[in-house]
Every structure is written in C-alpha cells, then in structure tokens.
Design a protein with these regions (language model features):
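Predominantly cytoplasmic-facing regulatory/coupling regions of multi-pass membrane proteins
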Residues: 1-98, 144-240, 247, 252-300
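Extended non-transmembrane interhelical loops and adjacent amphipathic helices
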Residues: 94-121
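Hydrophobic alpha-helical segments of secondary membrane carriers
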Residues: 100, 129-135, 268-272
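Alpha-helical architecture
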Residues: 105-106, 133, 244-247
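Residues at alpha-helix boundaries and short interhelical turns
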Residues: 106-110, 241-242, 259
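Transmembrane helix boundary and interhelical loop/hinge segments in multi-pass membrane proteins
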Residues: 110-116, 245-252
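Hydrophobic alpha-helical membrane segments of integral membrane proteins
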Residues: 114, 128-131, 240-241
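Hydrophobic alpha-helical segments and helix pairs
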Residues: 119-152, 159
C-alpha cells in the first residue's frame, strides 16, 4: 500500500503543536486566560445581572448550581472511562478535567482540546493516554446522546432506536482500548446512560427558568428538555467556530419563541449564561482544591 505523504506545512504544524503541548508555560497561560475570560464576561454583563429579580431567581440559581455539579461530576467520571476505561488514574484525570472546564468558554472550542493535551503532556508524561482520540470520542458521544434525548421527546421508538445506535457507535469507538477492565459494550452503555442523565439535568435547569418567567401549560419538562438537547447539540457540533458560544444562545432563542413571550427570551438566555459561568468557576475551583488536598494526604 502506498503511504500518503503529508505536505510540508502540515508536518511543520504538527511539529510545532507537539512542542507547544510540552511547554508548561502554554498550559499555565491557557489556564489563566480561561479564568480571566469568563470573569470578564460576568463583569461586562454586571448591569444586566444586577437588574435580574434576584428575590425570585435566587432559589432557581442555587438549585441549578447543585444540579450542574451533579452533571459536571458525571461528565468527569465519563471522561475517565473514555480515556482509561477504568478508575485507576481517576484523580489525575479529574485534575485535568476540572482544570480545563473553563477552556470550553474560550472562543473556538479547540482551546479546550489543546489545553487537555498540553496538561497531560506536561504533568503526566509517563502515563500513556490517547488524549486526542478521547477528546473526539467525548465530543461525538455528547452530540449523539443529545440527539437521543431530543428524539425521545418526538417518539419513544425513535429514542430507543437512536439509543442503541449510539451504544453501537460508542462500543465501536472503544473497542481498541486494550487496557480496559470493562467490556466495551458494558462500558458504552454506562457512558451513554450517564450522558443522558447530564442532558436531563440541563433540561431541568431550563425548565425551572422557563416556568419562573412563564407559568403557563405550554411550558413542560418534555418541551424544555427537547429545546435544551437540540440547541446544545447544535452548538457542540459547531464548537470550533469563534462564535460557537453564541450559537447555543441563538438556537435557544429560536426554539423558545413558541413557548414564552419574546421579551422574556433574552432574560432566560442571560440567566442560563450566568448560571453556567458561575457554576463552572465555582465548582471547578472547589474541585481542584479538593483534589489538591487529596493529593497531599496521599503523599507519604
């Protein structure tokens, strides 16, 4: 078989990326920027945030923070299963996961992937992991499970069919994980179910927000779940674009106009943004501090 020869510019790019991954300054700089950026967004939106009716929004805000942490914790578990297929290196995987959560907020989702690769290369050079492949698998399964959730709201039959299709795809993607202690099929079913729970959590948060601004029979959990799954899956699909973060906002706005008054759509989008930014900042910081304490206690 004839080998495909890559162009010189692509070889140079790959070489520079590898050098970048191994540079501790790059991962540190990216971590700092990932914290500054969401804080800046919150600061720029401070006038709108202060105008929120916190007397009624506070309860939903606090409940959403708790639900969000459950979802974040489950996604952290799934990440460890995807990259290792087991929990023997769960703490180191968790450290990388929470350290790079905020990088998803940076324009162009590729920074999240680059940050992960760089941290694994710098902090855990002796632990062999297929980070790039795992990033892709995580991204693809998240989109597929989001579509599974959406199809369930249209028809249970479509939901079941798409569920087994997603399990089959996930099993195929994980089949070469020779170090896995769990059979690929069992691992795939676990991952898909855990991600569906995460999608349900997002739908619940949106449902609380919608019922807070529009107490009508039109707003149901099923509708909220469908809107959340479809809008978020679309934004994940287009995450690589600089305006990827805004795609979910536009998708949410388009899908919510039939459920609530147009004047309240922007309010819900702002509330979603505030909850997610605050939750990412708070829970990632708290989790990293806990992991540091755990690491210190485990050190002889």
């Amino acid at each position: 078989m004839t080998k495909v020869k890559l162009p010189k510019w692509s070889l140079n790019l790959i070489k520079k990326l590898k050098q970048l991954y191994g540079n501790p300054r790059f991962s540190k700089a990216l971590s700092i920027i990932s914290v500054i950026y969401p804080l800046t967004l919150l600061y720029l939106s401070r006038k709108e945030i202060l105008k929120l009716e916190w007397s009624s929004f506070l309860r939903v805000f606090l409940l959403s923070l708790l639900i969000y942490y459950i979802s974040m914790s489950l996604q952290n578990i799934v990440w460890s299963l995807i990259i290792d297929g087991k929990f023997t290196r769960f703490l180191s995987n968790s450290q990388v996961y929470f350290q790079t959560v905020l990088m998803k907020k940076l324009p162009g989702g590729v920074w999240h992937w680059l940050g992960r690769s760089s941290i694994y290369e710098v902090d855990f050079p002796d632990e062999n992991r297929a980070v790039s492949k795992s990033n892709f698998i995580e991204w693809l399964i998240l989109i597929l499970t989001g579509l599974v959730g959406y199809l369930f709201t249209i028809s249970p039959y479509l939901g079941v069919i798409s569920f087994f299709f997603t399990v089959a795809i996930t099993t195929w993607l994980l089949r070469r994980n020779e170090e896995s202690l769990i059979k690929p099929l069992r691992l795939a079913v676990s991952i898909v179910i855990l991600y569906l729970i995460c999608w349900l959590a997002g739908g619940q948060i949106l449902y609380w927000l919608l019922t807070e601004v529009q107490t009508t029979a039109l707003v149901t959990f099923k509708t909220s779940f469908a809107i959340w799954c479809l809008s978020s899956a679309i934004s994940m699909l287009l995450f690589i674009f600089p305006s990827g973060a805004l795609i979910r906002d536009f998708s949410l706005a388009a899908l919510m106009t039939n459920q609530i008054e147009l004047s309240k759509v922007s309010l819900v989008i702002l509330q979603v943004r505030v909850i997610f930014l605050a939750a990412d900042l708070f829970w990632s910081f708290l989790s990293l501090q806990f992991l540091k304490l755990k690491k210190v206690r485990n050190t002889p």
